[in-house]
Amino acid sequence: MTRLLDTGLEQLTVMVYRSGEAAGNAINVSIRGLLNCKDETETVRELSDIIGSMTVEIENKAFELIVKYQPVASDLRIINSYMKIAYDFERYGRYAWDISFTQQKLAKINKCAVSSDLMLKLIEKVTGMVNKSVAALKQHDAELAKTLGNTEKEVDELYFAYLNKLSKARSKDKCVMCNLLVSRYLERIADHTTYVGEAIVYIATGEKIILR
């Protein structure tokens, strides 16, 4: 027999997944703007605001389920994990906006094309992690979620290698500042994908792990 709480949890699952899709879209738009030297600041800001509103709706839904149905420990685990994931998706959106805003303010859009192999690899790794985190949530795939840990270590290596390269650059102009900040935002997004992965593993198996 299906519990009323189960229906509510299914609704919560859909809400969080849609938030993840929106967050992934925000990152894709910001990266597209970065690579194509196009100002996507307003578009990404709007997406980030939408994700923020979705997070509030998710929190309200979670509290509604807790108050109405007084869930047992296993259900509370799921609800709490979804709230954590929603927060991390909100951070995806915020960092996407930070990337676009930094590009617009410092790089003046057309002056700083991304050409470094290290930065391009960093972008590829991080966007892949974002997509994988959303896919793992949709499927409640603990094994897929666990793979985010190894990729995050690769991102850290690329990030520090890129920092080392920038530190040796003769020019310390706005392009260098822009690339430095963007690489940091990408590294932070990667961190948040591992937090999502940890929560997915907990939802699927009840196992508490650290992926970073």
Model-derived features with residue positions:
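Cytosolic, long alpha-helical scaffolding segments
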Residues: 1-212
